[in-house]
């Protein structure tokens, strides 16, 4: 049962994290009559602008997080970022709090160690070789064992922060320092993993719903500096490799438990599929589903967490997304060129309405459909390039 917002019968959902992905989740929640409460570390975040009300707290502060949940008494708590005091969610779940998909899933995936150990050591899934390191000495020893090239990442980071590829041992000191600067909760533990010379990487959006496990068509993407630049759907792959990918994704999602959409990241080399990471929430590369599917990843996530069925997912054909990435400093961001950006057929645009920029930041995404993937990607890139950001 779903009541009406601002009434005693309202179904209340609290978003922990109010960025562009949270904003789309909030929109889908409101389409089904759910009262939305936004929480983030800074004011006027994108989802806060459309939430019924919002709060600014440090979500890594366990006392502050518990206090805001006890104040609002949400029926659903929806973590949208990693930098959260997840142990508080675990404790409150035992007291009756409904965390999406589960508090355990949120805690395991908040850092790379929990999910990597689950996938490789508990589930026995194929992954790259890896070591976790607390000190620079351990870090250098791990590089010696794995060899170069290898990849280093903070165990807790997002959007590529702190990630680098070491192609020569002489780069190790710089890579260690960069990883220490890039962690979401400050410096600390890192993962060093073998570099898989993959043919391509995919995000397999996997939904655990009341009527079973569902998959979106595979999404291909291009990364740069650890963050996605373009994504496209469907990624071409053989039926055998797709089946292997779906089997891996199913095992991970079922092990994490709960209802919701999961972004499962996989590497493909020949006929081999390797597990990389998973997010128990919509994925940035999945922004392409805003134009490629009848139900976007956000709509699917909301259906699942509300206990509603997903009878089918229709994919419209070759589609792509390209980010609007800007570097600068301003608290008065404005946009020009929108008419040019939207002049071509089957193009859309999402501007995230982020309140400020200080450095490099993703401010929007261009979306496109076309006759084939290459054409769709080029159309999305062309659209994104025509958006002019004024400071």
From Swiss-Prot:
<keyword id="KW-0658">Purine biosynthesis</keyword>
<dbReference type="InterPro" id="IPR016185">
    <property type="entry name" value="PreATP-grasp_dom_sf"/>
</dbReference>
<dbReference type="InterPro" id="IPR048740">
    <property type="entry name" value="PurT_C"/>
</dbReference>
<comment type="function">
    <text>Involved in the de novo purine biosynthesis. Catalyzes the transfer of formate to 5-phospho-ribosyl-glycinamide (GAR), producing 5-phospho-ribosyl-N-formylglycinamide (FGAR). Formate is provided by PurU via hydrolysis of 10-formyl-tetrahydrofolate.</text>
</comment>
<dbReference type="GO" id="GO:0000287">
    <property type="term" value="F:magnesium ion binding"/>
</dbReference>
<keyword id="KW-0547">Nucleotide-binding</keyword>
<feature type="binding site">
    <location>
        <begin position="20"/>
        <end position="21"/>
    </location>
    <ligand>
        <name>N(1)-(5-phospho-beta-D-ribosyl)glycinamide</name>
    </ligand>
</feature>
<dbReference type="Pfam" id="PF02222">
    <property type="entry name" value="ATP-grasp"/>
</dbReference>
<feature type="binding site">
    <location>
        <position position="354"/>
    </location>
    <ligand>
        <name>N(1)-(5-phospho-beta-D-ribosyl)glycinamide</name>
    </ligand>
</feature>
<feature type="binding site">
    <location>
        <position position="112"/>
    </location>
    <ligand>
        <name>ATP</name>
    </ligand>
</feature>
<feature type="binding site">
    <location>
        <begin position="361"/>
        <end position="362"/>
    </location>
    <ligand>
        <name>N(1)-(5-phospho-beta-D-ribosyl)glycinamide</name>
    </ligand>
</feature>
<dbReference type="GO" id="GO:0043815">
    <property type="term" value="F:phosphoribosylglycinamide formyltransferase 2 activity"/>
</dbReference>
<dbReference type="GO" id="GO:0005829">
    <property type="term" value="C:cytosol"/>
</dbReference>
<dbReference type="Pfam" id="PF21244">
    <property type="entry name" value="PurT_C"/>
</dbReference>
<dbReference type="InterPro" id="IPR003135">
    <property type="entry name" value="ATP-grasp_carboxylate-amine"/>
</dbReference>
<feature type="binding site">
    <location>
        <position position="80"/>
    </location>
    <ligand>
        <name>N(1)-(5-phospho-beta-D-ribosyl)glycinamide</name>
    </ligand>
</feature>
<dbReference type="GO" id="GO:0004644">
    <property type="term" value="F:phosphoribosylglycinamide formyltransferase activity"/>
</dbReference>
<keyword id="KW-0436">Ligase</keyword>
<feature type="domain" description="ATP-grasp">
    <location>
        <begin position="117"/>
        <end position="306"/>
    </location>
</feature>
<feature type="binding site">
    <location>
        <position position="277"/>
    </location>
    <ligand>
        <name>Mg(2+)</name>
    </ligand>
</feature>
<dbReference type="InterPro" id="IPR054350">
    <property type="entry name" value="PurT/PurK_preATP-grasp"/>
</dbReference>
<comment type="subunit">
    <text>Homodimer.</text>
</comment>
<feature type="binding site">
    <location>
        <position position="284"/>
    </location>
    <ligand>
        <name>N(1)-(5-phospho-beta-D-ribosyl)glycinamide</name>
    </ligand>
</feature>
<keyword id="KW-0460">Magnesium</keyword>
<dbReference type="InterPro" id="IPR011054">
    <property type="entry name" value="Rudment_hybrid_motif"/>
</dbReference>
<dbReference type="GO" id="GO:0006189">
    <property type="term" value="P:'de novo' IMP biosynthetic process"/>
</dbReference>
<dbReference type="GO" id="GO:0005524">
    <property type="term" value="F:ATP binding"/>
</dbReference>
<feature type="binding site">
    <location>
        <begin position="193"/>
        <end position="196"/>
    </location>
    <ligand>
        <name>ATP</name>
    </ligand>
</feature>
<keyword id="KW-0479">Metal-binding</keyword>
<feature type="binding site">
    <location>
        <begin position="158"/>
        <end position="163"/>
    </location>
    <ligand>
        <name>ATP</name>
    </ligand>
</feature>
<comment type="similarity">
    <text>Belongs to the PurK/PurT family.</text>
</comment>
<feature type="binding site">
    <location>
        <position position="153"/>
    </location>
    <ligand>
        <name>ATP</name>
    </ligand>
</feature>
<dbReference type="InterPro" id="IPR013815">
    <property type="entry name" value="ATP_grasp_subdomain_1"/>
</dbReference>
<protein>
    <recommendedName>
        <fullName>Formate-dependent phosphoribosylglycinamide formyltransferase</fullName>
        <ecNumber>6.3.1.21</ecNumber>
    </recommendedName>
</protein>
<dbReference type="InterPro" id="IPR005862">
    <property type="entry name" value="PurT"/>
</dbReference>
<feature type="binding site">
    <location>
        <position position="201"/>
    </location>
    <ligand>
        <name>ATP</name>
    </ligand>
</feature>
<comment type="pathway">
    <text>Purine metabolism; IMP biosynthesis via de novo pathway; N(2)-formyl-N(1)-(5-phospho-D-ribosyl)glycinamide from N(1)-(5-phospho-D-ribosyl)glycinamide (formate route): step 1/1.</text>
</comment>
<keyword id="KW-0067">ATP-binding</keyword>
<feature type="binding site">
    <location>
        <position position="265"/>
    </location>
    <ligand>
        <name>Mg(2+)</name>
    </ligand>
</feature>
<dbReference type="Pfam" id="PF22660">
    <property type="entry name" value="RS_preATP-grasp-like"/>
</dbReference>
<dbReference type="InterPro" id="IPR011761">
    <property type="entry name" value="ATP-grasp"/>
</dbReference>
